[in-house]
Amino acid sequence: MKYIITFAMCLFLMCSCDYHDFELSEKEQVFYINQMLHFSIEPWDSLSKAYTYDFFLRTPKPCKEVDTIYLERKIPNKFEVIESSSYTREYNRDPSFIKLLPNTQYIVAHTGIGARVNIFKYYYTDPFGKLHANDSLNEHINVDSIRIHLNR
């Protein structure tokens, strides 16, 4: 009986797990986000003059949808965006564009639709303000977070 319950639970988890990740196309400077609920781009250093961006959906949508956020184009109206700065202690609602400072490290967080979806990835900007993935740090953090999760 114990094995039947374990098998049923594994089957349920395999069928209910959805793809919640997000990707950055460095060439196009576009984020592709699967099943978005909340998305944020914030500087790693809280004393930096860079802005933090929090993205929320204005209207509910189907779960199986991919949202796109262009870093070099105008922000679409389907997102409610809050731009804030810890350096100047001010915020703006619905800015037109995303302004990333050159030579700055960023943390991008995705809270997806589903239970306990909270993904963090690390990026940096080059001297021209283009965002790039910090692959060595992302791999290190992902392996450690898996180990921590398995040890609980």
Residue ranges and their predicted role:
Residues 16-76:
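N-terminal export/targeting and maturation segments
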Residues 108-112:
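Conserved structural position at the C-terminal beta-strand
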